[in-house]
Structure formats: C-alpha cells, structure tokens
Amino acid sequence: MSDKIGLFTGSFDPMTNGHLDIIERASRLFDKLYVGIFFNPHKQGFLPIENRKRGLEKALGHLENVEVVASHDELVVDVAKRLGATFLVRGLRNASDLQYEASFDYYNHQLSSDIETIYLHSRPEHLYISSSGVRELLKFGQDIACYVPESILEEIRNEKKD
C-alpha cells in the first residue's frame, strides 16, 4: 500500500496559531504532509517568502512527517502531482470559507480527478484568527503574540529591524 501524502497550502502571511493547529491535526492523517507556501498575486505581501518558510520550518520542527515547500506561479494541483500528494487539506473557519474553497475544489477535481480535498474545521479558539487580522493589528502596533507561533513573531521582529 502506498503512502498517504497530503498538501496543505496557503500564503501564510503570517502563519497563525489557527494554521498551526490545522497542520498539527492534518499531520496525524498522513504519512507525509507538505505545507506549501504559495505567493498570492491578489494579496500584498507582508513577509518575504523566505521569512515565512523559515518561520514555518521552526514552528513545525516537532512534526517529523511535515515538510515546508515554497511555490511561485504554479497551480496547487500541479504541485500536488509533482510531490505525489493525492489529498489537499483545507482549513475552514465558517460557511464563507467553505463557499470560497468549494470553487477551488471543483477546478482542482476537473484538473486532476485523483486528488481529493479534505476539510478540517477550525477549533473554536481559532475561528476568528486570520492573517489579514494579524496584519491589521501589526499596522497599528498591537501585540500579536497570542495569535502566531513564536518563530513567526521572531521573523516579524527581524523583518522590522531591517
């Protein structure tokens, strides 16, 4: 029997504790879980991808079956095929997230019918945490320590120094 390989993608700009929770839970479902940092052309970048990757690798270092990869200008299904992933993992906070994700699921299935999407619901304590909300708090100098992993906080502090 072949290994179960999953792919969880996002812009992770920045990664939140909600992302971390979904990744930790998804890692228990697969032999190998890739976490793909994707550049979203519709979003203004806050942290450079290199900083995001470094922060994610530190935050996920305790998960032996998880590997962080970065991708520019590729479709998720193409990355999944390249990595041998047959499952896409998506986190859902609310009905709006499901509606948004369903359209991508449709196209992904059209492009590769052997790739399935698995949805994991956010835990109640993470329902209202979003990367855009964290960026907004940062814009106004607010403390975000309770919303992001320590390694991400370090990357943000280091980026602000430069």
From Swiss-Prot:
Cofactor section: Mg(2+)
GO molecular function: ATP binding; pantetheine-phosphate adenylyltransferase activity
UniProt keyword terms in alphabetical order: ATP-binding, Coenzyme A biosynthesis, Cytoplasm, Magnesium, Nucleotide-binding, Nucleotidyltransferase, Transferase
Binding site for substrate: 11, 43, 76, 90
Biological or metabolic pathway of the protein: Cofactor biosynthesis; coenzyme A biosynthesis; CoA from (R)-pantothenate: step 4/5
Nucleotidyltransferase in keyword set: yes
GO cellular component: cytoplasm
Source domain of life: Bacteria
Keyword Iron carried by entry: no
Pfam families according to UniProt: CTP_transf_like
Site (Transition state stabilizer): 19
Broad enzyme group: transferase
Its EC number(s): 2.7.7.3
Cell compartment(s), UniProt: Cytoplasm
Positions with a binding annotation for ATP: 11-12, 19, 91-93, 101, 126-132
UniProt GO BP: coenzyme A biosynthetic process
Swiss-Prot/TrEMBL catalytic activity: (R)-4'-phosphopantetheine + ATP + H(+) = 3'-dephospho-CoA + diphosphate
Family under the similarity heading: Belongs to the bacterial CoaD family.
Role this protein plays: Reversibly transfers an adenylyl group from ATP to 4'-phosphopantetheine, yielding dephospho-CoA (dPCoA) and pyrophosphate.
Alphabetized NCBIfam families for the sequence: coaD_prev_kdtB, cyt_tran_rel
Subunit structure: Homohexamer.
Protein name, UniProt field: Phosphopantetheine adenylyltransferase
Species this chain originates from: Streptococcus pneumoniae (strain Taiwan19F-14)
Gene for this chain: coaD
